[in-house]
């Protein structure tokens, strides 16, 4: 997965993807945000898996 696909998936599910990516801290990412994980060099598919784990109510069509 590329970063652009990660951002697209986040945009598809969250009404404010920019705020979600910069403000929501994920224990699944070690206590950092999506943007910080990207900067750190985490693989986009691993970041997406963490987002899904962080949001268990996410419908299957977005997973």
Tell what function each PLM region has:
Residues 1-63:
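C-terminal alpha-helical interaction appendages
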């Amino acid at each position: 997965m590329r970063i652009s696909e990660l951002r697209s998936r986040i945009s598809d599910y969250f009404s404010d993807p920019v705020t979600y990516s910069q403000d929501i801290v994920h224990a699944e990412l070690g206590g950092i945000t999506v943007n910080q994980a990207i900067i750190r060099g985490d693989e986009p598919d691993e970041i997406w898996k963490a987002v899904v784990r962080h949001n268990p109510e996410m419908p299957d069509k977005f997973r």
